């Protein structure tokens, strides 16, 4: 069976994924699938850096605003709904372009491992999500408990080994139906960090404080409230810290998150990054996409 061609734009927060995704969608007759765990939530627009209405008018976006704020969203939900979106886009004769920085979601969509049956697949992904939330120390402690020997530097192999130990022969390795062109965006670290700091300031100017206060007042304990951009402001609302300290914490957490994203994509998905500071970087990417789409 011929594989479905997908384009995936990945990289750290604030690097310019949204803008590139829209440009590629306009150039190659594509539609965008958001690969972000927070952008699924309605009414949370500023803190999630959701594509603006003007940007969404330039290219159709899937998996944005598909959950109420008080609903949970899992990697299983994403994979299931992303597959539907891919089929919908393909049926229109268009190119699916996945844009996002939630690495576990993208990896789970692209790879071929699965358990038989829909309920079992949900079980696998829930277990994987639980393992991913563990620290390195806790993860390798689980390996030790089960007498599994894995190099401590390799989280991916560790998680796969634990999945195999839990599910055994029920864990099947089928070929992925997707042929994916991974486009990784990166920038000089200090330039990226400066951009993150400026973006947080712009978010505050655009009403992030009010958006976070609404979430704090109405849904302080839901999954969505745990996201970066909201949880840092909650201590300010409860009068534990001044606003300046909360904003500084938000900037710091976002920078750390960007670093973790880069590490994930490098180590877990073998992404080769293109520096957005390079001259004509978008033209280079467009040539890669054109060659990919024209190949058999």
Swiss-Prot record:
Residues 36-39 are annotated as: Interaction with substrate tRNA. ATP binds at residues 11-18. The keyword DNA damage does not apply. The keyword Nucleotide-binding applies. Substrate binds at residues 13-18. Keywords: ATP-binding, Magnesium, Nucleotide-binding, Transferase, tRNA processing. Its EC number is 2.5.1.75. It catalyses: adenosine(37) in tRNA + dimethylallyl diphosphate = N(6)-dimethylallyladenosine(37) in tRNA + diphosphate. SUPFAM superfamilies: P-loop containing nucleoside triphosphate hydrolases. NCBIfam families: miaA. Catalyzes the transfer of a dimethylallyl group onto the adenine at position 37 in tRNAs that read codons beginning with uridine, leading to the formation of N6-(dimethylallyl)adenosine (i(6)A). Monomer. Belongs to the IPP transferase family. This is tRNA dimethylallyltransferase. It comes from Streptococcus agalactiae serotype V (strain ATCC BAA-611 / 2603 V/R). The lineage of its organism: Bacteria, Bacillati, Bacillota, Bacilli, Lactobacillales.
